[in-house]
Amino acid sequence: MIVRLTSEHPDGARAARRLRARAAAFLAALGREDAELSILLVTDRRIRTLNREWRQKDQATDVLSFPISEPPGAGALLGDVVISLDTAARRARSDGRRVGAELDRYLAHGILHLLGYDHERPADARAMAEKEAELARAEGLVGAALREGRREGRAGEAKDRWTRSPTSISTPSRSGSTARGSRAKTSRAGSRT
């Protein structure tokens, strides 16, 4: 397993160490010890530029995925996950959670997109949310996430970002995208995750 992590964020060193370790754990839990993954930790400004370039959406977002293969997840080289540390910090603050818990969620979500999961239809969104929750449970993150940011769901049950289905997230793709600009812009699809 190879996890490459680059931080373009001035405050990203600590988060980068966490994400590298968490990515290895997630890939192992998914049975993808053969995988190669690149993670890029960026500012809102940088992710906004990527979102505008590859998705024609001129706004910052939390995480983008750029699968290498078609279909996603078909080969050992999975692709790139780009995460905005600024967005993670802002949402964690507003939701009363630790930044690390927010980053874990974005990473799990991005990796699942690289493996072919999406949330275009309600059934797909549920399946993806269930897989995210499974990863969180496997890594012991659900209890911590609940302690850090408890939410009330329907019928009063506790919900957190690991167990809620994504609602405002879309996954359009554009052939030829690249997250880091280090690979040729051919046969890649970008997904907002």
Swiss-Prot record:
Predominant subcellular localization, coarse grouping: cytoplasm
Keyword field contains Transit peptide: no
Compartments it resides in: Cytoplasm
Any GO MF annotation of the entry: zinc ion binding
Cofactor detail note: Binds 1 zinc ion.
Superkingdom of this protein's organism: Bacteria
Enzyme class: hydrolase
GO annotations of cellular component type: cytoplasm
Chain segments carrying region Disordered: 143-193
EC number: 3.1.-.-
Annotated GO biological process: rRNA processing
Residues that bind Zn(2+): 109, 113, 119
PROSITE patterns: UPF0054
Entry keyword annotation includes Hydrolase: yes
Compositionally skewed regions (Basic and acidic residues) per UniProt: 147-163
Pfam families to which the protein is assigned, alphabetical: YbeY
Keywords: Cytoplasm, Endonuclease, Hydrolase, Metal-binding, Nuclease, Ribosome biogenesis, rRNA processing, Zinc
Swiss-Prot/TrEMBL cofactor(s): Zn(2+)
Biased composition (Low complexity): 164-181
Role of this protein: Single strand-specific metallo-endoribonuclease involved in late-stage 70S ribosome quality control and in maturation of the 3' terminus of the 16S rRNA.
Similarity comment: family membership: Belongs to the endoribonuclease YbeY family.
PANTHER family: ENDORIBONUCLEASE YBEY, CHLOROPLASTIC
HAMAP family in the cross-refs: Endoribonucl_YbeY (MF_00009)
Name of this protein: Endoribonuclease YbeY
Recorded name of the encoding gene: ybeY
